């Protein structure tokens, strides 16, 4: 079984609680999503490879460690994934960005792909798939399956919120993909929404219904 990393930092939990509020405005919800995703990036990339380089300070030459942001790809699952993309790019502005367009069939709850665009040479890159919610897991499973066809070095999945059903679905299909989240909520309802959840993340991010 794959691993689930719940990021319990007080700032992350505080902001998630503010996002849960029914009366949070679109502006507030969007800002909080951006802030949480930026904070989570520190933990998600804790084990990212580094390389040593020479540096000249104002006083002398020394060495330091840096990451190669160009080898990192944030893959946003459209459309809601774009709502947490900017926060992560704030921390790693040199990262490349890919997009997977998936929508949930309202009858089967299955994922249907309508768009796929990735940077070249994905075989040389580490991929972080992002989506605010890991609910039924169908979109996540489909996205990871599609990405594996491109042969990236590694894949991680990042979401603000998930539930036992979503975790089980992704790890059953892809036990090698770790999940990073701010919380694991109680369950799904009959419509495939997380309870207690934050509502429809895409609608709340973009002010649509």
From Swiss-Prot:
InterPro entries, per the entry: PRibTrfase_dom, PRTase-like, Upp_B, UPRTase/APRTase, Ura_phspho_trans
Reactions catalysed according to its record? UMP + diphosphate = 5-phospho-alpha-D-ribose 1-diphosphate + uracil
* Alphabetized Pfam families for the sequence: UPRTase
Task: Output the GO biological process annotations, alphabetical, semicolon-separated.
Answer: UMP salvage; uracil salvage
Task: Identify the domain of life.
Answer: Bacteria
Q: What class of enzyme is it?
A: transferase
Q: Does the keyword GTP-binding apply?
A: yes
Which Enzyme Commission number(s) are listed?
2.4.2.9
Q: What does this protein do?
A: Catalyzes the conversion of uracil and 5-phospho-alpha-D-ribose 1-diphosphate (PRPP) to UMP and diphosphate.
For this chain, the family text in UniProt reads: Belongs to the UPRTase family.
Tell me the PANTHER family matching this sequence. Answer: ADENINE PHOSPHORIBOSYLTRANSFERASE, URACIL PHOSPHORIBOSYLTRANSFERASE, CHLOROPLASTIC
Name-wise, this protein is Uracil phosphoribosyltransferase
Lineage start: Bacteria, Bacillati, Actinomycetota, Actinomycetes, Mycobacteriales
Q: Which gene produces this protein?
A: upp
